[in-house]
Structure formats: C-alpha cells, structure tokens
Design a protein with these regions (language model features):
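Alpha-helix N-cap/helix-start and coil->helix boundary motif
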Residues: 47, 151, 243-245, 266-267, ...
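Conserved AdoMet/S-adenosylmethionine-binding subsite of the radical SAM
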Residues: 182-368
Length: 395
C-alpha cells in the first residue's frame, strides 16, 4: 500500500528508523501480565495467545473461542458466570487465570456530562480516560491513553509536562474501553447497526500512540474482532503528532482513521510547539499523510489545529494550511486552547477563530470548531495529566 509507493532508498531509511523506534519503545515496556500469585491476565492476549494459554492447561482450541466470547462480547470478569462452560473447568480457569480491569481510582463528571476516569494499573501507575457523550444523540467517544506520561513535550499540552513513565500494555489499553463500558452498563456488545452509547474510540489521550505501536495495534485488533467488542475500524481514530516512519505501518496493518496533531504550518514554529517536528518536519509529515491508505473522500484525514492567540492564528497561517493539505481528503478541527495550571498560552478570540475557519472552508475543507468539553474537570483536549512518575524521579 503506502509503503510500496516509496523509493527503495527512502524505504530502507524508513525501515531502519522503524526498527530504532521499536527498540527504544521496548525500554518503556509495561510490567508482565502474570500476577504475583502465578495467574495470567487474559485480557490483552491475541486469539492465538489465548488458545496457547488454554492448551498449556490441557484444554482444546474451541475453549478459546468460548472464553473470548464471554470476555469481549459479554464483558464478564468472573469465570463462574460462563454458563456454557462446565463448573470444573470454570474452577480450573480461575486457578490459572484472571480477567481484570484497571481500577477506577477517581471518576469525575463534568457539568456537560463528560466523564473522566483516573485508571490505576496493577503496578500503581495511572492514566486518564475520558468519555465525551454526544448531547444530541445517544452515543459518544471514549478518549483512550496509550502511555503513562508522554515523551513529546508539546508546549501547549498539559500531558507534555509529565515525563514518560512507561507504555501501556494491550490489556491496559483495551481495559480502559472495557472499564468505561462497565461504568455505563454497555454489555453485552451491541451487534450490527444497534446503537452504541460508547460508539467510537479516539486514541487521543495521554501519550503518543505510534511510540507504543505494538501494544496499540494489538489492542485495536482485539477491539475490532467481530466475535467480541466488534467495533468497526471506521469507529476508531488514531491521533499522532507525526511519527512518520510508523504511519505507513499503521495504515497498512490497522487502516483506522488518522488524525494528525499539526498545530503550525511553518517548521520554525512547529519545532517550538511540537518538538517532534525537528525529527520529522512538516514536508515529511504531509507526504506520509498523502500515502496513508485509508485516506479517501469517505474517510478523510483529520488535521488537529489548536488555536493559540497571536501564535498560529493569522490569515496567512490559514492560507498556508490550505496550501499544505491541498489534494488530501481532509478536514481541519480547530481547537480553542484549553488552559491548564502553568500554561503560557491563551486561546484565540472567537472572531479570529471564525476568520481562520472561513478561509479553510472557502478552500473546500470542512473546518469545525471543537466545542470544549469537560474543561471544569481538566478533561478537555490538552488538559490530561496524572501524578505518576518514572522511577528515580523526584516525588
């Protein structure tokens, strides 16, 4: 797909960079999925891994399908309620395995009904997840974190002030969505066109998903499995600040919707706002967007653009944005800056945002202005942060 369009020399360089990224990622691996008592966490295992774990205790392959159904379609956490499995096997499973969830250490609900979860994992580390309900329809998006902390240090983002602690494992990523569904009682998984209250996943929480690609991909493959949660890839959006070498792979292997945190149209400014730009500048990022295989008129790439007063909000910026994305099936989400303690930026004025949006729309691109949600509980875009710290950090 996208990779096949690249010249060999570029492909070799990109592949080498992918290897480097994955090797660096391994330094921040999540803790083992086996508990101190020897039991194995089943959430987060692929179908093949689940079958292998059951085979190791003497069970046949069809048992994996049964357990998968109970975990991901029915949403159970107790083997004793798996009515299609005989009691002796239920007890055997309970002796060897566990079906866990992250602990909801704190749950806050905004005046606009946005709900923020502070999830605590087995090693005590924490990440935040946000459910954003649609106020017109019975549906909503779950904003999921991929890392504890973040390594990117984007200047306008609260998460960027928190050092990267570690990656989240597939179980912890899937677990956020499952625990949110527990909170709203959305089990068993709706089928077909049946409306879903938690209808979409946006990988826009804490962390850079493409710096934890293996775990994110594994989690999303589980979520998309038709015999479990069965969420369509069209209902999943992966947001990246521009880890260019991993974008081709994500497009080829997952094919989910892509959102790009752009925020500036000149390299000198983006170098400051999104330091990752120094490694993968705007021209490389836009080229990767053009290669992204899911991009079509029906599945547009979303460019996220935070509106910062006097920084990136001029008509010249808007015209340059239009020039950059010309020919890409795209929409531009304009995000009024959401303040957080210690931030140095202000949001652009309403008229300034409207003027910017009109320039983009006049060029033929949808340019909605995102309505801030959950600001009063620091759950809006760019406001997520926990107190988790890397080992050795000051307390």
């Amino acid at each position: 797909m996208g990779v096949a369009l690249m010249q060999p020399a570029i492909l070799d360089l990109t592949e080498a960079e992918r290897v480097r990224i994955l090797a660096k990622t391994a330094r921040f691996n999540p803790p083992p999925a086996r508990l101190a008592d020897g039991r194995r966490e089943l959430i987060g295992l692929s179908r093949a891994e689940l079958a292998a774990e059951l085979a190791a205790i003497g069970e046949k392959p069809f048992r994996a399908k049964q357990v998968w159904h109970w975990m991901y379609h029915q949403g159970v956490t107790d083997f004793s309620v798996m009515s299609s499995i005989a009691r002796p096997l239920q007890e055997k499973l309970a002796e060897n395995f566990v079906i866990g969830r992250p602990e909801a250490a704190v749950v806050q609900t905004s005046t606009d009904e946005t709900r923020k979860f502070l999830f605590r994992f087995r090693d005590g580390q924490e990440a935040e997840t946000v459910y954003i309900p649609d106020r017109q329809e019975d549906r909503g998006a779950v904003c999921i974190s991929s890392q504890v902390g973040c390594t990117l240090s984007c200047r306008f983002c609260h998460t960027g002030t928190q050092t990267l602690v570690r990656n989240l494992g597939a179980a912890e990523i899937v677990g956020q969505f499952m625990a949110a569904r527990d909170s709203y009682g959305e089990w068993p998984s709706p089928r077909g066109e049946t409306p879903r209250l938690l209808s979409t996943i946006v990988l826009m929480g804490m962390g850079e998903p493409l710096y934890n690609y293996e775990n994110v991909a594994k989690a999303m493959i589980i979520v998309m499995d038709n015999e479990g949660i069965a969420l369509s890839r069209r209902r999943i959006t992966l947001s990246t600040s521009g880890v260019v070498p991993m974008m081709d792979r994500a497009g080829a292997e997952l094919g989910v919707n892509l959102a790009v945190s752009l925020h500036a149209v000149r390299d000198d400014l983006r170098d400051e706002l999104v330091p990752l730009n120094r490694k993968y500048p705007i021209a490389e990022l836009i080229a990767a967007c053009r290669r992204y295989p899911a991009a079509s008129n029906a599945r547009r790439i979303t460019f996220e653009y935070v509106m910062l007063k006097g920084v990136n909000d001029t008509p010249a910026d808007a015209h340059e944005l239009v020039r950059l994305i010309a020919g890409i099936p795209a929409k531009v989400n304009l995000i009024p800056f959401n303040p957080w303690p210690g931030s140095v930026y202000e949001t652009s004025s309403g008229p300034t945002i409207d003027r910017f949006a009109n320039i983009v729309m006049d060029a033929g691109f949808s340019s909605p202005v995102r309505s801030p949600r959950g600001r009063d509980i620091l759950a809006a875009c760019g406001q997520l942060r926990t107190e988790s710290q890397a080992k050795g950090s000051a307390s």
